[in-house]
């Protein structure tokens, strides 16, 4: 009796809360853990205690020559999680879902330059609004 009860219990990340092992495939909905292959293979039990056996694919189309020491488990040994135009990704994203996983470094530098210009422009603009804000505060004080 313990066996059927275990079979009925189904881990939420892999199988839905409905009956664990219906006549249909175990996981009709492809969860994020296994985007391409089914979550529970027909040969294996419907809901194994272990997580999805299928490893997440690595959509990073970058060769092994990419100078990226960080190789997360999501990417195979032949694939690095950084494009050719990038040095490396300091924070390896989850399975390199975004092909531009390293563009964050470049964007960070660009943002720094842009933010500097924005601050200069911003410092000039705020000089006008302060008067409006001051009047608003006075109105609130009167109330």
Swiss-Prot record:
Keywords: Cytoplasm, Fertilization, Membrane, Mitochondrion, Phosphoprotein. Signal peptide: none annotated. Testis. Is selectively expressed in the spermatids of seminiferous tubules. It is found in: Cytoplasm; Mitochondrion membrane. The keyword Phosphoprotein applies. Disulfide bonds: none annotated. Residues 101-143 are annotated as: Disordered. One of its GO terms (biological process) is binding of sperm to zona pellucida. It is a peripheral membrane protein. Its main location: cytoplasm. The modification Phosphoserine is found at residues 37, 44, 110, 128. GO terms for cellular component: cytoplasm; mitochondrial outer membrane; mitochondrion. Residues 113-126, 134-143 have a biased composition (Polar residues). Involved in sperm motility. Its absence is associated with genetic background dependent male infertility. Infertility may be due to reduced sperm motility in the female reproductive tract and inability to penetrate the oocyte zona pellucida. This is Sperm mitochondrial-associated cysteine-rich protein. It comes from Mus musculus (Mouse). The gene is Smcp.
């Amino acid at each position: 009796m313990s066996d059927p009860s275990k079979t009925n219990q189904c881990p939420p990340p892999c199988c839905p809360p409905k009956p664990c092992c219906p006549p249909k495939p175990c996981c009709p909905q492809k969860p994020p853990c296994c985007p391409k292959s089914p979550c529970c293979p027909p040969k294996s039990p419907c809901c194994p205690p272990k997580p999805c056996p299928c490893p997440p694919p690595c959509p990073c189309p970058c060769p092994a020559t990419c100078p990226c020491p960080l190789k997360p488990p999501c990417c195979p040994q032949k694939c690095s999680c950084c494009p050719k135009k990038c040095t490396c990704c300091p924070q390896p994203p989850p399975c390199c879902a975004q092909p531009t996983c390293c563009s964050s470094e470049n964007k960070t530098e660009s943002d720094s330059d842009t933010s500097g210009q924005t601050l200069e422009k911003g410092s000039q603009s705020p000089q006008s609004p302060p008067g409006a804000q001051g009047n608003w505060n006075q109105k609130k004080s009167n109330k």
